[in-house]
Curated annotation (Swiss-Prot):
Residues 11-355 form the Kinesin motor domain. One of its GO terms (biological process) is protein transport. This is Kinesin-like protein KIF18A. SMART domains: KISc (SM00129). Glycosylated. Gene3D superfamilies: Kinesin motor domain. The lineage of its organism: Eukaryota, Metazoa, Chordata, Craniata, Vertebrata. Residues 834-843 have a biased composition (Low complexity). GO terms for cellular component: caveola; centrosome; cytoplasm; cytosol; kinesin complex; kinetochore; kinetochore microtubule; microtubule cytoskeleton. GO terms for molecular function: actin binding; ATP binding; ATP hydrolysis activity; microtubule binding; microtubule plus-end binding; plus-end-directed microtubule motor activity; tubulin-dependent ATPase activity. InterPro entries: Kinesin-like_fam, Kinesin_motor_CS, Kinesin_motor_dom, Kinesin_motor_dom_sf, P-loop_NTPase. Residues 368-453 form a coiled coil. SUPFAM superfamilies: P-loop containing nucleoside triphosphate hydrolases (SSF52540). Residues 667-690, 830-871 are annotated as: Disordered.
Amino acid sequence: MSVTEEDLCHHMKVVVRVRPENTKEKAAGFHKVVHVVDKHILVFDPKQEEVSFFHGKKTTNQNVIKKQNKDLKFVFDAVFDETSTQSEVFEHTTKPILRSFLNGYNCTVLAYGATGAGKTHTMLGSADEPGVMYLTMLHLYKCMDEIKEEKICSTAVSYLEVYNEQIRDLLVNSGPLAVREDTQKGVVVHGLTLHQPKSSEEILHLLDNGNKNRTQHPTDMNATSSRSHAVFQIYLRQQDKTASINQNVRIAKMSLIDLAGSERASTSGAKGTRFVEGTNINRSLLALGNVINALADSKRKNQHIPYRNSKLTRLLKDSLGGNCQTIMIAAVSPSSVFYDDTYNTLKYANRAKDIKSSLKSNVLNVNNHITQYVKICNEQKAEILLLKEKLKAYEEQKAFTNENDQAKLMISNPQEKEIERFQEILNCLFQNREEIRQEYLKLEMLLKENELKSFYQQQCHKQIEMMCSEDKVEKATGKRDHRLAMLKTRRSYLEKRREEELKQFDENTNWLHRVEKEMGLLSQNGHIPKELKKDLHCHHLHLQNKDLKAQIRHMMDLACLQEQQHRQTEAVLNALLPTLRKQYCTLKEAGLSNAAFESDFKEIEHLVERKKVVVWADQTAEQPKQNDLPGISVLMTFPQLGPVQPIPCCSSSGGTNLVKIPTEKRTRRKLMPSPLKGQHTLKSPPSQSVQLNDSLSKELQPIVYTPEDCRKAFQNPSTVTLMKPSSFTTSFQAISSNINSDNCLKMLCEVAIPHNRRKECGQEDLDSTFTICEDIKSSKCKLPEQESLPNDNKDILQRLDPSSFSTKHSMPVPSMVPSYMAMTTAAKRKRKLTSSTSNSSLTADVNSGFAKRVRQDNSSEKHLQENKPTMEHKRNICKINPSMVRKFGRNISKGNLR
């Protein structure tokens, strides 16, 4: 980005911008006095040819009163017409001189022109169209970021205005500031504050605050007329990062100036303060014009330049004719209302082209003190280490590149040709493979869509049957059958095509195996060459990428189909629910609502509220009638590409194949399996045996599964089965007897113990629990494995007296399913402890010395009268050996104590 002095233009660069006409000028019908010819030439007050004819002859009518057109041609460095944008002005004015600014040259951009010509709009702009100042700051910091690795850059800014020949700081509240001249620094404003922003956002914030403090008042010519000259200056200091005793520091200054417009009191209507402001503005602009005339007059040498006639010209001393590269933006109006102002602006701009500057880069050679030598040496050492690391990385990369080049040269020409041939074959194979796979996924999506549409047709027909009359149902049935037949035919066709695509895919896979085998023959060890192996892997990855993208597209299509059906269902529900509520309220007010209707309405309310139902861990709750709609996981699952089986002669197992993912039915997890699920079979290992621990054997443990009598209604209430763990037997202990005339329960006690608990049968053997279940036919159907158990010498089968299981208050078990509250009551009462034997008598020969606890079902007459099927469970404990004491966990529930 270095710029030499020979490359720079020593003349002031002048551009002209013509603003568009405003609504007021268009309404008045003023003619234009500025005509833009091209990007460099414009004509002021062009001639208008008026040709008149009288009786077919040309006549020249000379109007003596009419003023002759000047028809002046001006040539500038750039001319912007009415359609130009802020970015175009920035690209041709400020952006080119930023290179000079970064190389240490002072630069100035000033906007000159009459009031209302568009100077402030060009320099500052608006929120929608930022001006030159804003764009300059953004581009400057962008350039600084590009060179931050080579140079250390620091910036400082100041913002002032010249108002009524007084200088004020726009960034802080201060009084008038004095202008002084320094032999080294040049023109200096004493007391002007400098701010050091860290980013372009911060510097733009400072610029915005300064614009708010600037003096502006409306006049007859301009609603937002600037009453002062604004000067925004940026100081840039650059220093090389390379540590050295002699440091080269570049210091440059850029000035962005927005001048106030010249005006006439007769046209602007200025009075009082506005008149004084206009006078001072014209005075400073007149001094500026004189300076421009003096600098442009090359005939007179050593001529005095009147810089001190105004504060403005004193500030612009460096910018005009000094060590500065200056660009003037002359803003003019095309309307004839500003005829004189436009002419004067163009005249001064044309003279400013002749101003020459003496450009010199501001580079200072700073000699560091001897005390800084140690710091400089350390910085140089760190820089040397950094450069060595970069050089080492470069050499390693170069060596790796050389090895690859040598490896390529070592490959013989015939082998290269073979590799190229196989690469072409792989391209053709995978291109065909990709087409087959895409077609297969498309067919799979169409089949899923066909399945969904079939289900939606059936669902719609069911709704019509529930809602419409018989005639409409008959018509709908005909339409449904016709559509289902079409869908079925379509499905058969799609399935046939899918099978064909699968066959083609298998053929492609076989060809791929053959090609892999042939590629393995290229090397002596039977492995595929690295080049071909990489190509093969890339082809597989590309195929997987295409496959996943296609699956995503198909999923979106299916989701849209489901969303459409969901919206239709939602519309039906939104129409039905208010109608149902209205009918319910009407029937209730008329007294026509019965208990069944109330129950149905409450059930619908629960469904609408989405309330959850509490169930036991192993309880199989009555599920509503399932529809045939496949789950979302099934619909959104496509056959995936699995790895191809590796071939024997090739070590690489690249390739893909179609693998169908089996869909698993979602099941509810159980905390502990029920002992009635047939877990104690011979096929199950000992580690999977059912643990039949008593719920009260270890302090407080809740029942982890629902009692069978509460979970399911009995088929034969006169027979039950008792399951009990024993510590002395490893097989089943069956006890059966006939029922008596008082509907006593027939009980068959089958005792089983898991293998993993044979060594842990200490005190817990006393904590046994009987579980009532069905017997005879139902038990034979449920546990067929029990009949096939081997009866070895260790198995003991004992028949006990049925009178020992007779109960005092025995009654048939109700056949209906108990309510949730009944199940909860049964669970609570299961933990009750009754040590007396007055309620029930349990007599048995206990030769092994263990305790038994029997749960019985009792119900009171009061409950029978109220038709509430509640079941009481009482425990009866037989006489046990005094040395064996039963331990129970305490339950702090009040409902368990009587």
